[in-house]
Amino acid sequence: MRKHWLDNIRWVTVLIVVIYHLFYMYNAEGIVGVVGKITSMDVQWFDIFMYIVYPWMMVLLFIVSGISSRLYLENHTNKEFVRSRTTKLLVPSTIGLLAFQFIQGYVNMSLGGYGGEFDQAPLFFRYLIMALSGTGVLWYIQVLWLLSLLLVLVRKIEKDHLWNLCGKTNVIVLILLGALVWCAAQILNTPLIVVYRFGLYGCVFFLGYFIFSHDEVIERVKKWFPLFATVACGLCIAFCIVYFGQNYADLPINRSPLFTLFAWFMSLAIIGGFARFFNFENNVTKWFNKRSWGLYVFHYLGLSTVALLFGKSESIPAWAIYILSLAASFALGYALNEIISRIPFFRWAVLGISKKKPEKVKEIEGNDNVQG
């Protein structure tokens, strides 16, 4: 049976990611790789949105991915799982870079102000550099593909013994797991590209697979939703007060106890809240859920293009740049999804979409979304 609350978490979180990237592009906190501050405000108070959502939004998506992986594997073999994840995750983050995302790479490099020496390099070399620079938001599926392969190895060893044991997880264990998440955040972090956090994201992915894929655990999370929500809101306020104005995405903040505990308890609160109040499907949720993957893949191109054309030169008022950037994120994101998903080779290379499956097969697979 399909878990609609899981779908709803996924597409709502993707919307949050899009809005986050808007504020990230024009942040006043000195985070590099983007346009930066374009307003005349002494303090950009609306940047606080980044502090409210950044610690937990990708943690939550990896938990959802872990849950979805378990749901898929209940009806498929390990071999089918690897094949599916390779098509859904590896192909778009490798072949997709060469087929389409080099465009994003060009925009990213232009925003960064690449030097004149690049223009003197051979065309093929420039193309490869642009393709690699176009990775952008696809880091998520690169990490997820590696974790999916690791999951297959783990399954061959544990043979559901650990999974069955994890079904007994109670609220005390859920609270104490915050310490495990903090420990995981300290290891396997790449030194320069801060988004590749294999320790943290690997930990919550496997927690999603082993713990949150149990219906009885979700019932406990639903029951204790008021507690988790209260703690999460308190940690959110504390995080914003302590760190606002600082680079929240890098050391030492992104490995601090406050960062990781906020991420953990907010994830618990959202899972409990959505399972309790948003376990439904209607035409609106179906529309957003169906297009969430395409929006995730393409939204940054619209945003960064507007940033390059108008934000970098500040040729129009700041408020207009914000509005135009947000509109471009959604408009181009959804438009490219509709176009690319209909072109045979590119739908496979860029979005990881193979042949269309019969509706009955889709229903059996349940929550098998690309982000799972």
Question: Where are each of the predicted segments found?
Answer:
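Alpha-helical transmembrane segments and their immediate juxtamembrane cytosolic regions
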Residues: 1-372
